[in-house]
UniProtKB/Swiss-Prot annotation:
GO CC, any one term: cytosolic large ribosomal subunit
Keyword Ribosomal protein listed: yes
Pfam family, one: Ribosomal_L19
Matching InterPro entries: Ribosomal_bL19, Ribosomal_bL19_CS, Ribosomal_bL19_sf, Translation_prot_SH3-like_sf
Lyase as UniProt keyword: no
Protein name per its UniProtKB record: Large ribosomal subunit protein bL19
GO biological process, one term: translation
UniProt keywords, alphabetically: Ribonucleoprotein, Ribosomal protein
Organism from which the protein derives: Mycobacterium ulcerans (strain Agy99)
SUPFAM superfamilies assigned: Translation proteins SH3-like domain
Source lineage: Bacteria, Bacillati, Actinomycetota, Actinomycetes, Mycobacteriales
């Protein structure tokens, strides 16, 4: 194992739940405003998961006041307090970019049974 792999291994988090594209999750993000630190919840559908190891990222999409908002998070970021899986989605794709054009009921994802 070379030095970079050793450093990467030490930085990996082990408290991340298993989730995949199509799942609805709550991401609890640490927000620092001046000297204060608070936790902000970002709830949405995972539309992609990309990369591996320390460089792994995922993108969450939500509708906020009729406007689509997407946010990409590193999986092993120290700015993420914790992740909570709300529902498991039943999808047939790994990347759900088609949800960007859909609105309302058409953007609904079936729940896994």
């Amino acid at each position: 194992m070379n030095r970079l792999d050793f450093v990467d291994q030490a930085s990996l988090r082990d408290d991340i739940p298993a989730f995949s594209p199509g799942d609805t999750i709550n991401v609890y993000v640490k927000v620092i405003e001046g000297a204060k630190e608070r936790i902000q919840v970002f709830k949405g559908v995972v539309i992609r998961r990309q990369g591996g190891g320390i460089r792994e990222t995922f993108t969450v999409r939500k509708e906020s006041y009729g406007v689509g908002v997407e946010r990409t998070f590193p999986v092993h970021s120290p700015n993420i307090d914790h992740i909570e899986v709300v529902t498991r989605g039943d999808v047939r794709r790994a990347k759900l970019y088609y949800l960007r054009e859909l609105r309302g009921k058409k953007a609904k994802i079936k729940e896994k049974r």
